[in-house]
Each structure stands twice: as C-alpha cells, then as structure tokens.
UniProtKB/Swiss-Prot annotation:
Residues 1-120, 311-330, 419-497, 571-604 are annotated as: Disordered. The keyword Phosphoprotein applies. There is a cross-link at residues 125, 133, 141, 147, 188, 277, 329, 336, 400, 414, 548, 648, 657, 684, 699, 709, 723, 749, 758, 775, 780, 791 (Glycyl lysine isopeptide (Lys-Gly) (interchain with G-Cter in SUMO2)). The gene is SART1. Disulfide bonds: none annotated. There is a cross-link at residue 141 (Glycyl lysine isopeptide (Lys-Gly) (interchain with G-Cter in SUMO1)). This is U4/U6.U5 tri-snRNP-associated protein 1. It comes from the Eukaryota. Residues 157-231, 490-533 form a coiled coil. GO terms for molecular function: RNA binding. Residues 32-42 have a biased composition (Basic residues). Sumoylated with SUMO2. It comes from Homo sapiens.
Length: 800
C-alpha cells in the first residue's frame, strides 16, 4: 500500500510529462523487497564489486528496457488495475490533454540520447514552421523513471472509454441543439409581427425611410448615367450588350421546324428536351427535332404490336379513304408491305410562331374525317326484335286513315208496310261465304255480302220544295270527292259500327223467324195433303228422292260416307269460328252451300251428293290418271330390276319401314297415292290471328325429339370415324394430303381390319389354322414340324 501511495505522489508531481522507452513501453522499477535484497547482497560482497555490478545492471537495463518493461507491466497489472479504479476523473481529463508533439519529442530525446536533444524553444520554432501548436513552456518536465522510482504505464479501462465516448456524444448533441436554436431564433413565427405594423408612428417612420432610400438610389443612377455620357461609356456598353442579344438563340428561331413525334405524345406542363435528329452529312434535308426517350418508347410499342402476330388478311377492313387534305387517296392492294418498301411514315408536326404548337390543324383534319365518315352510306340494318301483340300509338296514327264526313240529308219517305211475301227466301240462295282460312287475315272484318234481288223501290213523288229538289244529296257509299271548303271528314267509331251491325242482324233474325213460321205452317198443310194422297195411291214417301228430310241409301252415299272417315290433313287449325257470323247464320250457310262445299271441312256423317257432279268428277279422274303404270324393262340392268321390285312392293326401303311403324293401320302403300298439302297460307294466317306473334311455342312439336346423326364415308363407302372425317375435311380444305408413309400405314391398318372382318371365328386373320390343316392332310400326319425336315424325324437310329 505504501508503494502505491508513493507512485501516486510521483504522478501528481510529474503532471502531464511521461518518458517513452525504446520498445514503446515504460520502465517500471522493481519492488522494494527485491531492491532491499540486491542491496543486502551488494553490501555483503564488497563496495567495489557491488558498484561494478550496479553499473552493469544499469547498462543492461538501458539496453533491455523493452523486455524489462514488458515484465514489469505483467507484474504490476493487478496493482495498476486497482490504482486506475481509484483515480479521479479530473486526472483522466488531464491525461487526455497531453500534447502529442511533446511526447514525441521526449521519446526521441530519450531514445537518441543527449547528443540529439532539442530545447523547447527550438522545438516550438520547428513546430511553428510546420504549422503545429507550440509546446507549453511552463510544463514541468520529468526525466524517465529509474530503477528506484519507476514510471508506471496507464491501464486502459474499457468502462472509462465508453463513458468518455458517451460524454462526447452528449456534448456534440448539445452543441448542435444550440446552433439550431440560434438559427431558428432569427425566423419569425406566425404569431409574431413586426412592431411597425401595430404602431402608426413606427410605420410612418419606416415608410419615410424607404422613400428616402429610393430617392437616393435614383439620384445615384442619374449621376452614373451622366458620368457615362460625359466619358462616352454608355454607347460602348449598349453596343456590346446589343450585339450579345442579337447573337442569342431564342424560341422565335424554332418557327418552321418539324418535330417527328405525334402531338399527343406531349403533355401540358411536362418538360421535354428535343434534339436534332441524326442524318448523313451529304443529306440535304431539313432539320428534325426528336426526343430520345420518345423514340425508344415508340420502338418498344411497335415491337409489342409485332409480337401480337395479328392476321394480315383483313378483307373487310375500313381504312381511311381520304388523306389529310380530305382528298380521295388511292388504295393499295398489298398495303402491309408498304412500310417495308417505302419506309416507316412517322407522325410529325411543325412548330408555329414562337416555337409553339397547339394542334389546331390536326383537330380540324379530324373533324373533316368525322364529317366524311358520317356522309358514308351505312348498310347496317335494324336487328330483329319480338313482335308486340298490340300496336303502339305511333303505329296507330299511321294505321288510321281519316275520312271526310259527308253531310247526309235524309228525306222523309212514306211508310211502306212490309209483308212476308215481299221478303225473298234466304234459304235457297247460295252465299259466297268464307268457310276456310285462306282469307282469314284479309277478309276478317268483311261481312259476307248477300246479293239480294230487290224489287225496284218506287221513286218518291217530286217535292213541291224546289230547294230540296235541286239539292245535291250524297250518300256514304258514293265515293265522290267532297266539294272544296268542306270540313275534314272523320272516321266513324268502331263501336258505333259494331252496334249498327248487331242491330241489322237482329232485324234480319226477326224477319227470318216470321218467315220460318209462315213456311212451317205452309209445309205442314202440304205434308198433310201429300200423306192423304199417298195413302190413297198406295206408294211410300221414301221413293221421292227430292223430298226434304229423307235419307237416301245408295252406292254413292255409302262411298261419300267412307270418304268422310278419312281425316283431312292441314285443316287442324281451321276450327276457329268466325266472329262476325252468328249461330243462325252458320246453320243457314251450311244448308245453303250443300254437301259439295262442306265436304272439305266436315266429311263425317251423312251428306247429300249431287250425282251429276260426282259422275263428272269420276270421269275426269279416270281420264286424267291411268290405272296401271308402265313397268320398266328388266333387261336394261340392275337398277331397272330394283325399280320394278320397288313399284310392286317387293322391296321395302327404310322409309317405308318407318312409315309402317308409325301408321300400322295404313292399308295403302305410300307409293300409290300422295296428299297435296296446300295449307301454307292457312298456317300463316292462323298463327298470326291466334297468337299475334312468334312468342308462342309449337304445341304440335312438343313430343318431337330429333335424332341427328352425321356420317361420312370414304371413296370405298366405308364409314369414317370422327377423327378420320375431320382429317379428310381438313385435307380437302387445305388442298394437301398425308405423306407417303402415313398413307401406307393407314392402308395397312385398313387391310388388317378387313382381314379381321373376313376371318373365321376359329381361325386367325392370316388363315394359319386352315394352312395347318391343309399341310396335315397333305402329309397325312396329326402333327406338323415347325423346324427341320421330316426325314430327320424318321431317320434310322445308329445302334452300337
């Protein structure tokens, strides 16, 4: 402990001085115990010997100071560690402030000896020449430690180093914060205002000061101008600066230059650098401005379009038929090669006055193109749409036709009493009614006109009033043109027309009822008289063929009855009743038309037949058709024989089989007769009237399930598989076939399939079993030798 205190006192006295050895390590004196031991030895051996050994030890210590220093450092490591922990922080700071130059000078002095030593003044002069900080003169320099008083080296403490670094960082952060606060202190915040803004006097003073500064500046400028004019400097300056202004290249020099890009490539507010396009030295072309980035972008877009591999054949492509000047330009046949032959035609525009471009000309050209496109004739038609069940108001306006209403003046006629004899019998006359559906759409609203032979109506007596006699009276049925200036004629209401029709029908019904009552009473009287006469004469009523209500049994009636059982094809949709005719009118028309016209629709049951007409029809059919067809000659070939068999019914085709399955009760073959279906008009109008459009389903086709099977055959008539059919169609479309190897392979495969079909169930495709049997028959053996010969099998064996 005493030694440590002694060393600490020596360090405090030394201050910041230190001595460096030749090996770079400080010398440390030995401990006191070792020193005392050597001293005791030297005292015991003698004075001269001890001094000699002491001197030699000192010289050795000077030579091997490095080695001894390392040993001393190792010996005092533990002691130095304890001492470093007890040192105060102030001494550490002093140690850091030691001058490096002084230590270097001291070390060099110690290592080189007294001969190469410099004084502090000389060292300071030398350091001043080198630009270094001079050494402190007042510092107390202490010589290197001796053996008795060694100098200990400082121990490196990592904790102290870390604390030192943290302290430096804190100091640097505080300094930076101080500088930042100083900089921000000069900036005014939003809440701070200048004092002269609120104070009126300060504001006036500041404005006066600014005005004075302006006046002084103007005076100085005038003074300088006067001095320049006196010495002639102003003219020289103007000439120099004017020449420089003329030499400068400005935007007005860009007028007329061509920019080889589309005007849409430039966006408003975007800065883009344009450079002159590279061209040959001998090319006498105008300068063109381009942008390198836009050129690369256009090239990349073009490469992308080329990679898409669009089809070249576009027969219906609508190209621009006009050029930029709205002139018709010729169309090239192979326009896809124009770019390769003539070169690419880039988009370009010219700069206007001031080096600007607004794209007005391009917009005008686009408007012209749009107008020309609108003038073109369009061949596109309106797409199909569902027919509506009702007419729209617009269609109703076009459908209705206004008629002029004719003013009708009715004359007062004398009342004429109508008797039953005046009415003509309506049952005996024929009516041209519409009993079919061929005129369904056209004559629906037309009431069947009955031609009645009316007695001439007596003309009324001439009136005494000349105005009425000379008046031109027009009727609704007359189609004369109305006089000019007459009011516009309006169409009568449909409801009123319908009411008039119903009233007319009611009137006719009452007349018919009265007439029927009169007829019934007359017929009853006639029947009673005839019955009395027949009883007297003794013959029956049934023999009178013209008597009404009688049934005639003969061959013709039976034939007509049989024909009535055959269904009429094509009249399935003709069961619609006419709306305009009432029930009594239908009965009347059926009785008036007779059986000749009603056979087409109602052939079931009994009906009356006119014998004369039936004979004429039979004669016509007999004369027009032949009973026996001409038979084809068989010896002409196989086709004639097949035709003969088909006509006689010996050969049944697939169509006849299907027909027989569908209609098993059909007695007559389909080849003998045919049914003419002329009901296309009926179907047309019936569908339109019944459903009013094509939105309804086909009810008659509900159970129909089509069975479509498409088959293809080759040249030999063999059915092709889907793959083979596709290959055949593809070859026919492209105009080329398979190669030789594929064709041979396919033919070989077909031959094998043919052999498989021809082979027997008990044999192979090549007939090896049959060949084996033939071989066995020829050799008369139950076996066959596959290799070798039969002689080897029957050879005599060699015996010993």
């Amino acid at each position: 402990m005493g030694s440590s205190k002694k060393h600490r006192g020596e360090k405090e006295a030394a201050g910041t001085t230190a001595a460096a050895g030749t090996g770079g390590a400080t010398e440390q004196p030995p401990r006191h115990r070792e020193h005392k031991k050597h001293k005791h030895r030297s005292g015991g051996s003698g004075g001269s010997g001890g001094e000699r050994r002491k001197r030699s030890r000192e010289r050795g210590g000077e030579r091997g100071s490095g080695r001894r220093g390392a040993e001393a450092e190792a010996r005092s490591s533990t002691h130095g560690r304890e001492r470093s922990q007890a040192e105060p922080s102030e001494r550490r700071v002093k140690r850091e402030k030691r001058d490096d130059g002084y230590e270097a000078a001291a070390s060099s002095k110690t290592s080189s000896g007294d001969a190469s030593s410099l004084s502090i003044e000389e060292t300071n002069k030398l350091r001043a020449k080198l630009g270094l900080k001079p050494l402190e003169v007042n510092a107390i320099k202490k010589e290197a430690g001796t053996k008795e008083e060694p100098v200990t080296a400082d121990v490196i403490n990592p904790m102290a180093l870390r604390q030192r670094e943290e302290l430096r960082e804190k100091l640097a952060a505080a300094k930076e914060k101080r500088l930042l606060n100083q900089k921000l202190g000069k900036i005014k915040t939003l809440g701070e205002d200048d004092p002269w803004l609120d104070d009126t006097a300060a504001w006036i003073e500041r404005s006066r000061q600014l005005q004075k500064e302006k006046d002084l500046a103007e005076k100085r400028a005038k003074l300088l101008e006067e001095m320049d004019q006196e010495f002639g400097v102003s003219t020289l300056v103007e000439e120099e600066f004017g020449q420089r202004r003329q030499d400068l290249y400005s935007a007005r020099d860009l007028q007329g230059l061509t920019v080889e890009h589309a005007i849409d490539s430039f966006r408003e507010g975007e800065t883009m650098i344009l450079t002159l396009k590279d061209k040959g030295v001998l090319q006498e072309e105008e300068d063109v401005l381009v942008n390198v980035n836009l050129v690369d972008k256009e090239r990349a877009e073009k490469n992308v379009e080329l990679r898409k591999k669009k089809p070249d054949y576009l027969p219906y492509a609508e190209d621009e038929s006009v050029d930029d000047l709205a002139q018709q330009k010729p169309r090239s046949i192979l326009s896809k090669y124009d770019e390769e032959l003539e070169g690419e035609r880039p988009h370009s525009f010219r700069l206007e006055q001031g080096g600007t471009a607004d794209g007005l000309r391009e917009r005008e050209l686009e408007e012209i193109r749009a107008k020309l496109r609108l003038q073109a004739q369009s061949l596109s038609t309106v797409g199909p749409r569902l027919a509506s069940e009702y007419l729209t108001p617009e269609e109703m306006v076009t459908f209705k036709k206004t008629k002029r209403r004719v003013k009708k003046i009715r004359k007062k006629e004398k009342e004429v009493v109508v008797r039953a004899d005046d009415l003509l019998p309506l049952g005996d006359q024929t009516q041209d009614g519409d009993f079919g559906s061929r005129l369904r759409g056209r004559g629906r609203r037309r009431v069947s006109e009955v031609e009645e032979e009316k007695e001439p109506v007596p003309q009324p007596l001439p009136s005494d009033d000349t105005r009425v006699e000379n008046m031109d009276i027009s009727d609704e049925e007359e189609g004369g043109a109305p006089p000019p200036g007459s009011p516009q004629v309006l169409e009568e209401d449909e409801a009123e027309l319908e009411l008039q029709k119903q009233l007319e029908k009611g009137r006719r019904l009452r007349q018919l009822q009265q007439l029927q009552q009169l007829r019934d009473s007359g017929e009853k009287v006639v029947e009673i008289v005839k019955k009395l006469e027949s009883r007297q004469r003794g013959w029956e009523e049934d023999e009178d063929p013209e008597r009404k209500g009688a049934i005639v049994f003969n061959a013709t009636s039976e034939f007509c009855r049989t024909l009535g059982e055959i269904p009429t094809y094509g009249l399935a949709g003709n069961r619609e009743e006419q709306e305009e005719l009432m029930d009594f009118e239908r009965d009347e028309e059926r009785s008036a038309n007779g059986g000749s016209e009603s056979d087409g629709e109602e052939n079931i049951g009994w009906s009356t037949v006119n014998l004369d007409e039936e004979k004429q029809q039979q004669d016509f059919s007999a004369s027009s058709t032949t009973i026996l067809d001409e038979e084809p000659i068989v010896n002409r070939g196989l086709a004639a024989a097949l035709l003969l068999c088909q006509n006689k019914g010996l050969l049944e085709t697939t169509v006849q089989k299907v027909a027989r399955v569908k209609a098993p009760n059909k007695s007559l073959p389909s080849a003998v007769y045919c049914i003419e279906d002329k009901m296309a008009i009926d179907d047309k109008y019936s569908r339109r009237e019944e459903y009013r459009g094509f939105t309804q389903d086909f009810k008659e086709k509900d159970g129909y399930k089509p069975d479509v099977k498409i088959e293809y055959v080759d040249e030999t008539g063999r059915k092709l598989t889907p793959k083979e059919a596709f290959r055949q169609l593809s070859h026919r479309f492209h105009g080329k076939g398979s190669g030789k190897m594929k064709t041979e392979r396919r033919m070989k495969k077909l031959d094998e399939e043919a052999l498989l079909k021809k082979m027997s169930s008990s044999d192979t495709p090549l007939g090896t079993v049959a060949l084996l049997q033939e071989k066995q028959k020829a050799q008369k053996t139950p076996y066959i030798v596959l290799s070798g010969s039969g002689k080897s099998m029957n050879a005599n064996t060699i015996t010993k």
